Amino acid sequence: MAMDNVTAVFQFLLIGISNYPQWRDTFFTLVLIIYLSTLLGNGFMIFLIHFDPNLHTPIYFFLSNLSFLDLCYGTASMPQALVHCFSTHPYLSYPRCLAQTSVSLALATAECLLLAAMAYDRVVAISNPLRYSVVMNGPVCVCLVATSWGTSLVLTAMLILSLRLHFCGANVINHFACEILSLIKLTCSDTSLNEFMILITSIFTLLLPFGFVLLSYIRIAMAIIRIRSLQGRLKAFTTCGSHLTVVTIFYGSAISMYMKTQSKSYPDQDKFISVFYGALTPMLNPLIYSLRKKDVKRAIRKVMLKRT
């Protein structure tokens, strides 16, 4: 933040689930289960991919990065949401709130771009299998991942550094965590530039990658149709369908949050929508993308045999 940002507010009150006290225990239990599943599932995938040389392939390189992103993304907000469930003073200082906003934004943006890179990898693998190892070589994979991370950091820095927020007393955030939209809603400054930048950034990090992913899966579906075996087609469609479902939940919920005017924003609705891309998909990704694969099951058996 610029040094000339003068505010009358130094901490924020995060409402979280406190305006629904009857749901507090249920919410705490669900978030705890989701967070532990996120840690175990993604942490185990990172370990397994590093441990087994047979998983040192392009797709698992992408999946290990996705698992790392999901692990960090879940950790950026869920532990705080758990602590604040039963806290009598669920306050967060302005620097911590801004830091959480920056970290969550960078991780989410990187994941949006990484999912598009993974879709490209699958298209190459299915449409051009003979040249797959040539097209998706090590440097190309590293470049795609580095571009995802680099672009997310640059865009996040642009959005955060462009904030010139003056808070005139209101400090109640109706959310489970600090997000850039939550801060903008509280300010008494003119936020038209910030809203415009968020919209443009969302087009390049949400709408375009999601469109690319959908087109990629259409190409994959056309390739699957040419499979002669009915059982093979059904299995491929089931796999692609589950992948596409999770991707749609992630992109769709984020698009519904960030690509609308603030006048059409409903805080109670928005904070529960954020659970889909901030908590649910980080838990589901290792289950959908990795743990059902034969290579992963084989690697798990290998680990279990070594332990015995």
From Swiss-Prot:
Belongs to the G-protein coupled receptor 1 family. The keyword Transferase does not apply. It comes from Homo sapiens. GO terms for cellular component: plasma membrane. InterPro entries: GPCR_Rhodpsn, GPCR_Rhodpsn_7TM, Olfact_rcpt. Residues 47-54, 121-139, 217-236, 292-308 are cytoplasmic. It is found in: Cell membrane. CDD domains: 7tmA_OR13H-like. It is a multi-pass membrane protein. One of its GO terms (biological process) is detection of chemical stimulus involved in sensory perception of smell. Gene3D superfamilies: Rhodopsin 7-helix transmembrane proteins. Residues 1-25, 76-99, 160-196, 258-270 are extracellular. The chain crosses the membrane at residues 26-46, 55-75, 100-120, 140-159, 197-216, 237-257, 271-291. One of its GO terms (molecular function) is olfactory receptor activity. This is Olfactory receptor 13H1. PROSITE patterns: G_PROTEIN_RECEP_F1_2. Glycans are attached at N5. Keywords: Cell membrane, Disulfide bond, G-protein coupled receptor, Glycoprotein, Membrane, Olfaction, Receptor, Sensory transduction, Transducer, Transmembrane, Transmembrane helix. Disulfide bonds join C97-C188.
